[in-house]
Amino acid sequence: MSKAFVAIHCETGKENPIIRKLMEIKGVSEVTGTLGLYDIIIKVEAADSMTLEKIITKEVRKIPNVLTTMTLMVI
């Protein structure tokens, strides 16, 4: 099982719609709104690192109004 935490910076005021979309993504196991440089932190889990990468790059980063992400792989 591969895991990562992803910090998400998004357009101001768009946090709640993004949080709702994130909760619909298979593999996203936790979603938390935060204050500071990043607006949302998520935990992503997948069977392997390749699947994990696809979830982050093809689904999370493609959500409208997501500006930047920082991925922290769990070792």
Task: Go through each PLM region and give its residues.
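A compositional/biophysical signature of low hydrophobicity enriched in polar/charged and small residues
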Residues: M1-I75
